[in-house]
Amino acid sequence: MEIEKTNRMNALFEFYAALLTDKQMNYIELYYADDYSLAEIAEEFGVSRQAVYDNIKRTEKILEDYEMKLHMYSDYIVRSQIFDDIMEKYADDSYLQEQIAILSSIDNRD
């Protein structure tokens, strides 16, 4: 499995998991976060390996569709880069550093 794809799916899952069904959440989490094989997931849920594969592929598409429409992950990446740039450029400005920390904590809350 490609590391870049795994990282992206895990990130998209973090942003959009609440929009998925329980089965979609379980399969994606086991496959990408816990590194289960298709066979292990199939055995766990009493379904065929093909059923797991189909569900994961559909869910990947759903996650990508959510990102295309909502841009939550890509916006988070841009905000994080801007925060990092400000923190570096204005390292001596304690007020600005504090405000950036507050904004960052808003992005990172559950």
UniProtKB/Swiss-Prot annotation:
UniProt xrefs under Gene3D superfamilies: Winged helix-like DNA-binding domain superfamily/Winged helix DNA-binding domain
InterPro entries: RNA_pol_sigma_r3/r4-like, UPF0122, UPF0122_fam_protein, WH-like_DNA-bd_sf
Domain of life: Bacteria
Role of this protein: Might take part in the signal recognition particle (SRP) pathway. This is inferred from the conservation of its genetic proximity to ftsY/ffh. May be a regulatory protein.
Family that this chain belongs to: Belongs to the UPF0122 family.
HAMAP family (UniProt xref): UPF0122 (MF_00245)
PANTHER family linked: UPF0122 PROTEIN CBO2450/CLC_2298, UPF0122 PROTEIN YLXM
Protein name from the UniProt record: UPF0122 protein stu0888
Species for this entry: Streptococcus thermophilus (strain ATCC BAA-250 / LMG 18311)
Organism phylogeny: Bacteria, Bacillati, Bacillota, Bacilli, Lactobacillales
